[in-house]
């Protein structure tokens, strides 16, 4: 036992004056971890830069450092190995309820729900290092404000049942895993900057499935923790987490697919510097398009703000508000009807 100085990667004797009240489930020890390597290989597929990135991410999650402001999202089909990875790390760091560093939270904390209790759950983040949540339902939407709050590094306010609110400095890192990526109700650069999408491709077939893997991984926990510490050192001395091309491309693709306003502009609007369209007509067209496509309909005020964020200006003439630089496309003319009596 003892204390790991994460700045040096060394195990030193614990001192009472440090007032450490949490501990991992195992003591780190160098050694191979082939089973865990096989779990990670499903992600990095032998790409050394992606492999090193994953270890830096896991190493950073040992710390309470909040400078990176990252939300990790592991996604892929069911039976792809995501749960095995997350549960192994959580087991190594120990359950926060029992004096460890890992804590599970409800995904409803970060997605829109009818009975919104996300802010009530913030207190569950206090003191944790590795926070994880499982996303299981398709069609959910990110609660952008709370996601940015949870990974923004700012002081948080939480409240326990029957207690007064209390403030605390965050120490956690947020990992979410699931089969479906939540939707974004609006293009959000804050989410894009923080989001790291890690894809688990393929599925584990019945022939590949090993029901003993989770138990056999336990023997590798000390070595895995040792490698996480090495990843933490790499993060500190290599200039930060970095974001491999695969991760950045996945985020760009995701954001493009969630950009409903951009899709409407491409499909329904001509961009002509000398033209303008009334704000009311533009919004009614967008609303009809969004409803027809099952998309989220933002308010007219938010619609105008999002257009301004994309560089479109507004003007007013004769009591009518206009959006400059756009013109609604004319609807396609219906095909001519053919009356056999006209022959």
Task: Label every model-predicted segment.
Residues 1-80, 84-343:
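Feature primarily recognizes SF3-like P-loop helicase cores of small DNA viruses
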């Amino acid at each position: 036992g003892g204390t790991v100085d994460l700045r040096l990667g060394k195990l030193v004797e614990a001192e009472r004056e440090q007032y450490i009240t949490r501990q991992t489930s195992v003591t780190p020890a160098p050694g191979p971890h082939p089973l865990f390597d096989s779990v990670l290989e499903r992600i990095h597929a032998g790409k050394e830069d992606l492999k090193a990135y994953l270890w830096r991410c896991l190493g950073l999650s040992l710390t309470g450092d909040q400078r990176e402001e990252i939300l990790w999202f592991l996604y892929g089909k069911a039976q792809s190995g995501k749960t095995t990875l997350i549960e192994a790390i959580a087991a190594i760091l120990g359950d926060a309820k029992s004096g460890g560093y890992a804590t599970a939270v409800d995904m409803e904390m970060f997605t829109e729900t009818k009975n919104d209790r996300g802010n009530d759950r913030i207190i569950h983040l206090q003191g944790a290092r590795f926070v994880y949540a499982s996303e299981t339902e398709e069609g959910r939407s990110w609660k952008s404000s709370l996601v940015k709050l949870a990974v923004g590094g700012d002081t948080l306010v939480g409240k326990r049942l029957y207690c007064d609110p209390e403030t605390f400095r965050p120490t956690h890192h947020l990992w979410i895993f699931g089969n479906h990526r939540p939707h974004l109700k609006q293009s959000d650069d804050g989410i894009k900057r923080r989001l790291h999408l890690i894809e688990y491709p393929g599925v584990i077939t019945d022939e590949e499935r090993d029901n003993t893997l989770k138990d056999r991984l336990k023997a590798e926990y000390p070595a895995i923790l040792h490698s996480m510490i090495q990843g933490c050192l790499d993060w500190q001395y290599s200039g930060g987490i970095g974001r491999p091309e695969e991760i950045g491309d996945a985020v760009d693709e995701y954001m493009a697919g969630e950009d409903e306003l951009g899709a409407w502009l491409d499909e329904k609007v001509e961009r002509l510097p000398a033209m303008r369209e009334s704000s009311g007509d533009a919004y009614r067209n967008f609303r009809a398009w969004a409803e027809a496509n099952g998309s989220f309909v933002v308010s007219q005020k938010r619609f105008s703000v999002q257009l301004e964020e994309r560089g479109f200006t507004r003007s007013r003439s004769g009591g009518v508000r206009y959006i400059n630089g756009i013109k609604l496309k004319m609807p396609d003319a219906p095909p001519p009807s053919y009356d056999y009596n006209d022959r």
